[in-house]
Amino acid sequence: VRVRQRPSNPTLQLETVAPSEQALFATAGVNLKNFQKFLRRNNLSVLAIRDVTSRDDADQQQPFNLKVAGNNHQTINPAHPAPIYEIKHVQFLQNDLLRGIGGINTPKAGRRGIAKFLHDPTAMLYNPPTTGAQGSANIHPDGSAAMIVPAKRALTWQLTDANNKGIVRERLWISTKAGEVRTCTS
């Protein structure tokens, strides 16, 4: 048996924040390193989306003609220009682990995950007020949105209309590490 050197785990290396987001922090007068320290201390991270109206052309199962409600910003597929869906909020859901069947006094072993609207008290404390439902962030006129979320927690999200009805529901779960500022272009 020979010992072989294993490559370092890339997920353990520090993530870098994209230059465009670094510029936004600088313009707002926020020291990015101090902000990331604050996030780490509170076991939080930031998820930012540059343009929620932009979708993957290969996704034909979800609505893809999206327009920011009350604004002209939209992304329309010229081959299929209708219908157009107005979106107003991005709503995050967190995976809560619940005990299996059996009741409170005699629970059976095991846990199951269930999606619940974001309710982590620390994350909710530091997010700005929203006009949307629980766990929502307003979509800005340029199509961008950002939210402080709990780190080390499985998260998913959906885009909702002005009545908080889900329009685009993501079918994947992600998690972040404390202090991370993660950006998605669409």
Question: What is the predicted function of each stretch?
Answer:
Residues 1-186:
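Extended surface/linker regions that mediate inter-domain or inter-protein docking
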